[in-house]
């Protein structure tokens, strides 16, 4: 799984269409297909204000997943259990070390809809074939098999440190990671965003269609369509931080400690004036709130130095801090999601309007 090497704060990667630093710009890209070959971040919108991107399509020359078809399917004595042979497409070779079972999907040969099934055991045969024992309702010869070989990488569209950003009529057919990821940005709107596979395929993004962290203002998804993505169609949240070193009663170093780091591999930190909630892990009870008076981001050390307006408890064992200023009001209106993994909508904010959606 290349994620362990590629999805880190220090890994160097290419950016395709870099809009960093733009303001008061509308970019019309109707009819434009950004065809990616390999791992990269196709679009970056960073340190921007009042920018709208319209009509762009992001897709891949060689899809960041493998596709094959069931060529043999022999029932076992156990109900809905089969001995299966899968032949992979010519442009989808594998090796004995290729991760094949991170996240996969069986699709009906006629309808294309995913079937409820799992692989009990798997055997590599050659670079285009494997055999497996599969438990799956109604699996048959001709059904399609799709699998990804990595979870997180760079997103197709990365929005960071920006304000008043709109994506209109943008399509993402595939990405070895998430579709749209927003971080530390204010007032982001997605209008008629389509995260759907290219015609003839049944996988779009490896993981979330959209994901937003430490946002402010309003986050709006309107009349968007999400299909065959590998995780939630949207996930909106901030980060919990732990106090790692105390300088004084009001000054300390804090650090985000999730196993994979943040979703853009950028340091998360509060701004001066933000409100931090102190929460007890065992029962999620909020014990106190603090105003940030001073902050020093330390990306190389993956932590930040913070001064707050009144003393912290003598012991912070079992406690965590969350920046509740960076929780946007979320509107999800008229969107649809189907044939995907995980949840449809995952919201960890203090306010939302979710209506007229189909999942």
List where the protein language model places each region.
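Extracellular beta-rich repeat passengers
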Residues: 35-46, 166-169, 182, 211-215, ...
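Small/polar beta-strand repeat architecture
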Residues: 114-119, 123-153, 288-289, 294-331, ...
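Extended, non-transmembrane interaction/recognition domains
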Residues: 137-147, 169, 182, 197-200
């Amino acid at each position: 799984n290349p994620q362990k090497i590629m999805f880190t704060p220090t890994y160097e990667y290419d950016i395709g269409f870099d809009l960093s630093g733009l303001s008061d710009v509308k970019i019309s890209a109707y009819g434009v297909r950004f065809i990616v070959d390999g791992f990269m971040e196709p679009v970056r919108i960073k340190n921007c204000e009042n920018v709208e991107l319209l009509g762009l399509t992001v897709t891949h020359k060689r899809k960041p997943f493998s596709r094959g078809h069931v060529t043999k399917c022999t029932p076992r004595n156990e109900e809905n259990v089969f001995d299966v042979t899968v032949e992979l497409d010519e442009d989808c070779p594998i090796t004995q070390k290729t991760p094949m079972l991170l996240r996969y999907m069986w699709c009906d040969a006629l309808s294309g809809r995913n079937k409820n099934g799992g692989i009990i055991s798997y055997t590599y045969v050659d670079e285009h074939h494997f055999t497996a024992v599969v438990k799956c309702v109604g699996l048959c010869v001709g059904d399609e098999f799709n699998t990804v070989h990595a979870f997180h990488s760079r997103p197709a569209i990365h929005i960071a440190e920006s304000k008043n950003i709109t994506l209109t009529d943008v399509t993402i057919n595939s990405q070895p990671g998430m579709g749209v990821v927003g971080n530390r940005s204010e007032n982001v709107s997605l209008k008629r965003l389509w995260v759907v596979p290219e015609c003839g395929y049944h996988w779009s993004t490896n993981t979330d269609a959209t994901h937003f962290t430490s946002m402010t203002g309003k986050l709006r998804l309107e009349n968007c369509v999400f299909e065959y993505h590998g995780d939630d169609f949207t996930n909106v949240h901030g980060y919990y931080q732990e106090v790692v070193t105390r300088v004084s009663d009001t000054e300390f170093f804090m650090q985000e400690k999730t196993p994979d780091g943040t979703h853009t591999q950028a340091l998360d930190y509060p701004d001066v004036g933000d409100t931090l909630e102190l929460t007890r892990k065992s029962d999620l009870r909020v014990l106190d709130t603090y105003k940030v008076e001073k902050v020093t981001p330390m990306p190389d050390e993956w932590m930040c130095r913070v001064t707050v307006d009144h003393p912290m408890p003598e012991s912070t064992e079992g406690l965590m801090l969350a920046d509740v200023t960076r929780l946007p009001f979320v509107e999800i209106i008229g969107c649809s999601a189907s044939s995907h993994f995980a949840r449809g909508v995952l919201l960890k904010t203090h306010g939302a309007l979710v209506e007229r959606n189909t999942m």
